[in-house]
């Protein structure tokens, strides 16, 4: 057997996975998996920059995030795969598209891991005992601990994410209850009256004008990143057709309550000027209301969120890198699988990239979070656009009688897909308008695109060789032993 066919194996990219995620774990990942540093830490700086109208941005972005998830849900039920939309890009647009989106998504999660290690170090330094420890050392310790846990098994990942997501959800619910009590009772916070009068006394709903609201959109998009993880995780659960629709449809309530509701409540409890970048707005609130130890307790929660996000990032990149490695687009070692069903090669590669973030914490500790956050947003925009494009392609092929769409579908397709792509383009343009960090981030595409192009020419012969081998073993679809049944009408 050739080297290519050995990599492909009898069942393609899904070989070796243990399908060990339980329904309750996937449900909780769907509910709380995306509640991470983008909300717990990033919302503080965005409130300070854009004002209370920020909750409207969360709402608008949330609508499109839900549409993206419905598109992903349709693709998953069309053909479950741990390679997620990288595998679907290969199916609908070919190897070149899978190569490009796979590496862009890897860039997203590699940068997200840097964001998370930076956030963990930032949270820890809120306590005096850790202020004497350099930020980069704290980031390195966090990476080492989470990497070790992630390499054990998918069951460990699922259990860690279940409890971490539960803690995050309970913490946000506690904030919503306490905040609502203060708001309904008109109790002052830090000497300020609560409610709509707070907005009137501090410049209204848009105190900094509409432009900052547009500019912070890329950061809000990052706050929603990881919602697509439910699609990746569905490839490692036994019955995705039963639990995927429930997990995705629960996103509507989660967006309305946890994202839009919490940001609106924060803006009604304290002036937007009370929040600041680098500090969780939830920690700010609990510290201001005088609850003894409440700020420290909330800091533990947001620390859990950052650790959870880092854990999820390593999980996701391991699976994505395994998928593109099985096609020949990534280094061979990233296709390696442990006996416990963990694609450790891709996970370790992500950890190595994250070490550059540790170095960034050493040289630019004050700017590390915003720099890599913007770079991460580029990857998630590419990933989400791919999901929508694949769904549109499935819709077109179904109309032509070539494929069949599952019952769980993206609503108002194809028009909702076109509108979502337009939204993502607007986000990219507004990111470029955020000088200097956002402008420089988008400018890095001048380097990224030629680098991806050059990389493709380096690996294309190997990719095509693997594709030819795979066609003889699994059909054109590497995720299943037999390609899906197609209509011949």
Swiss-Prot record:
The keyword Cell cycle does not apply. Keywords: Amino-acid transport, Cell membrane, Membrane, Transmembrane, Transmembrane helix, Transport. The chain crosses the membrane at residues 25-45, 49-69, 100-120, 137-157, 162-182, 210-230, 255-275, 289-309, 344-364, 369-389, 413-433, 439-459. It comes from the Bacteria. InterPro entries: AA-permease/SLC12A_dom, Amino_acid_permease_CS. It is a multi-pass membrane protein. One of its GO terms (biological process) is amino acid transport. GO terms for cellular component: extracellular region; plasma membrane. It is found in: Cell membrane. The keyword Transcription regulation does not apply. Signal peptide: none annotated. Belongs to the amino acid-polyamine-organocation (APC) superfamily. Amino acid transporter (AAT) (TC 2.A.3.1) family. This is L-asparagine permease 1. It comes from Mycobacterium tuberculosis (strain ATCC 25618 / H37Rv). The lineage of its organism: Bacteria, Bacillati, Actinomycetota, Actinomycetes, Mycobacteriales.
């Amino acid at each position: 057997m050739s080297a290519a066919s050995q990599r492909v194996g009898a069942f393609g990219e899904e070989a070796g996975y243990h399908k060990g995620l339980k329904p309750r774990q996937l449900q909780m990942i769907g509910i709380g998996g995306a509640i991470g540093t983008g909300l717990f830490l990033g919302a503080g700086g965005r409130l300070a920059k854009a004002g209370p109208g920020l909750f409207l941005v969360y709402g608008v972005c949330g609508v499109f995030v839900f549409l993206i998830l419905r598109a992903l849900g349709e693709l998953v039920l069309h053909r479950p795969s741990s390679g997620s939309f990288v595998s679907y890009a290969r199916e609908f647009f070919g190897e070149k598209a899978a190569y490009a989106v796979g590496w862009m998504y890897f860039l997203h999660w590699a940068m997200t891991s840097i964001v998370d290690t930076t956030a963990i170090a930032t949270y820890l330094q809120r306590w005096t005992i850790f202020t004497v420890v350099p930020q980069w050392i704290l980031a390195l310790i966090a990476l080492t601990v989470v990497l070790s846990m992630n390499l054990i098994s998918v069951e460990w990942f699922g259990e860690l994410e279940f409890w971490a997501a539960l803690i995050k959800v309970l913490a946000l619910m506690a904030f919503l209850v306490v905040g609502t009590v203060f708001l309904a009772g008109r109790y002052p916070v830090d000497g300020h009256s609560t409610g709509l009068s707070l907005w009137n006394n501090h410049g209204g709903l848009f105190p900094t004008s509409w432009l900052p609201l547009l500019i912070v959109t890329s950061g809000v998009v990052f706050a929603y990143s990881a919602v697509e993880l439910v699609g990746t995780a569905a490839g490692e659960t036994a019955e995705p057709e039963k639990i995927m629709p429930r997990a995705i449809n629960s996103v509507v309530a989660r967006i309305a309550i946890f994202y839009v509701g919490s940001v609106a409540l924060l803006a009604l409890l304290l002036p937007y000027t009370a929040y600041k970048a680098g500090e969780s707005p939830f920690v700010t609130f609990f510290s201001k209301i005088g609850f003894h130890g409440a700020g420290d307790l909330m800091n533990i929660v947001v620390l859990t969120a950052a650790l959870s996000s880092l854990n999820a990032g390593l999980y996701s990149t391991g699976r994505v890198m395994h998928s593109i490695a099985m096609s020949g687009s990534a280094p061979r070692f990233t296709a390696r699988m442990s006996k416990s069903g963990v694609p450790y090669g891709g996970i370790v590669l992500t950890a190595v990239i994250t070490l550059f973030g540790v170095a960034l914490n050493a040289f630019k500790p004050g700017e590390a979070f915003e720099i890599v956050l913007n770079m991460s947003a580029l990857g998630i925009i590419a990933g989400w656009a791919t999901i929508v494009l694949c769904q549109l392609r499935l819709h077109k092929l179904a109309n032509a009688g070539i494929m069949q769409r599952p019952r769980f579908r993206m609503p108002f397709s194809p028009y909702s897909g076109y509108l979502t792509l337009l939204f993502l383009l607007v986000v990219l343009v507004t990111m470029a308008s955020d000088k200097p960090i956002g402008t420089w981030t988008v400018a890095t595409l001048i380097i990224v695109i030629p680098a991806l192009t050059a990389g493709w020419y380096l690996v294309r012969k190997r990719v095509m060789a693997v594709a030819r081998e795979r066609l003889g073993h699994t059909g054109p679809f590497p995720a299943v032993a037999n390609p899906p049944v197609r209509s011949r009408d």
